[in-house]
A protein has these predicted regions:
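Activation segment
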Residues: 101, 140-141, 184
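Nucleotide and nucleotide-moiety/phosphate-recognizing core
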Residues: 1-126, 134, 159-167
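Phosphate- and divalent-cation-binding pockets in alpha/beta enzyme and binding domains
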Residues: 54-55, 107, 139, 173, ...
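Short, solvent-exposed loop/turn segments at secondary-structure boundaries
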Residues: 18, 142-144
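Conserved nucleotide-sugar donor-binding
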Residues: 127-139, 177
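Conserved alpha/beta core of the MobA/IspD/sugar-nucleotide pyrophosphorylase nucleotidyltransferase superfamily
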Residues: 144-196
Length: 196
């Protein structure tokens, strides 16, 4: 099973690439990759786009870096680039999203059985990350690019299985300074981040 981190955006609301923001001395991308490896994802890929050279330094050794040369194509172009050659189910993680709980990842793995995709739902609302079957990942990687294509639309049309989780973090992102502050505050209090 593979994990794919999408980190190709401009980070226009932040001064630096979101993946390079430091959390307790380590870049956020580094922490995300290490967490995913600890959850049994033998292969972790990071898709870079804008600020790729600087962001690549924040990725730990042993993680495959993929450059999305079609940066203007947006997040879906990054997704397609990262999925090429995938050999099994793929967990799609956004660089500006909180990490899910280990229990959420486990439930997504169970929920993928017999489905094209599984996505977490907290209090009736969908969130991240999404787990794609090998068939869906291959179809997305080989699809013709449309500038209006979005993963949530693909998941809906594929009939993604919605998995109820007790993990508020699946709805959280880290787009604004306040979002980072909340994340760091939860870490400092040593509260489980997913209970938020």
């Amino acid at each position: 099973m593979m994990a794919l981190l999408l980190a190709g955006g401009r980070s226009s609301r932040a001064r630096t690439h979101k993946g390079c923001r430091r959390v307790e001395g380590r870049p956020w991308l580094y922490r995300q990759c290490r967490f995913l490896r600890s959850q049994g994802f033998a292969q972790v890929r990071v898709v870079l786009g804008y600020s790729a050279v600087g962001a690549a330094r924040c990725v730990p050794p042993g993680v495959r870096r993929i450059w999305n040369r079609n940066r203007a194509g947006g997040p879906f172009a990054s997704l397609r680039a990262g999925l090429r050659g995938a050999r099994g189910p793929v967990l799609v993680v956004l660089v500006d999203a909180w990490l899910p709980s280990p229990a959420t990842i486990y439930r997504l793995r169970l929920g993928l059985r017999g489905a094209y995709a599984a996505m977490p739902v907290w209090r009736g609302r969908g969130g991240h990350p999404a787990l794609l079957s090998h068939e869906l990942a291959t179809a997305i990687a080989g699809s013709a690019h449309s500038p209006k294509e979005r993963l949530d639309h693909v998941l809906a049309s594929a009939g993604a299985r919605r998995i109820a989780v007790q993990d508020r973090s699946v709805r959280r992102n880290m787009n604004r300074r306040r979002d980072w502050w909340l994340y760091l505050r939860c870490r400092k209090l040593r509260r489980p981040l997913w209970m938020g």
